Amino acid sequence: KNIFGTTVKVCEMQSEGGAAGAVHGSLATGALTTTYTASQGLLLMIPNMYKIAAEQLPTVFHVSARTVSTQALNIFGDHSDVMACRQTGFAMLAEGNVQEVMDLSAVAHLAAIKGRVPFLNFFDGFRTSHEIQKIQVWDYDDLAEMCDMDAVRSFREHSLNPERPAMRGSHENGDIFFQHRESCNSIYNDLPAVVEEYMEKVNAKLGTNYQLFNYYGAPDAERVIVAMGSICDVAEEVIDYLNA
């Protein structure tokens, strides 16, 4: 069961396109829903991702970021799939190791609920997704304590329900469409603070130091590497080795 005491239902669809449509429909009816995918499968979800983001539905797509096949098949890790989704309206959160996946996946779900912005939560395919490593597992009571239940209730109250008829999926002309599209800007402006708030709560519980951006190395460094994903742990080890 999840933190709400509900048995989780798992549905296998015919394709990633069908999975994205099922996630969208499930969210529209007030069920907190998530999915997992990678590579070409993620690309099939893009049309629904635009709708999910614009309707401010709090989902998380967990992605083991892998190469999008071009002239040949390649199933190894890179960010070509997730970068193809940057303009969908999904917030993006990356992890560098398996413990971060455990901790920051929770941040993605909690921030999506409170911030009303869906998340694309990703980590390097194979290098991180298939790593076997000991981790500190979350206690569901701690997760439930951090979850904004008022935001959950608000999400469910605005869901499609025959007892509360509402119109969704209307047609708009250019004079109104752009204004409505811009109206969500405020929630995106507020989102970094929401993510940071939950990172601080995780830090307080686990003794970690998660931030939106973490700096590692000498304060007077002449060269700086800006990176995300599994390369970060490697870079830290190289820094320690060179400064030893």
Regions found by a protein language model. Give the residues of each.
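Short, solvent-exposed amphipathic alpha-helical segments in soluble enzyme
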Residues: 50-52, 109-111, 136-139, 237-243
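Redox- and metal-dependent alpha/beta enzyme cores, enriched for Fe-S-associated oxidoreductases
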Residues: 212-244
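Thiamine diphosphate
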Residues: 1-84, 90-113
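Gly-rich Lys/Arg/Thr-decorated short loops/hinges at beta-loop-alpha junctions or inter-strand turns
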Residues: 2-6, 62-63, 85-89, 178-197, ...
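Conformationally flexible catalytic loops at phosphate/diphosphate-handling active centers
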Residues: 119-215
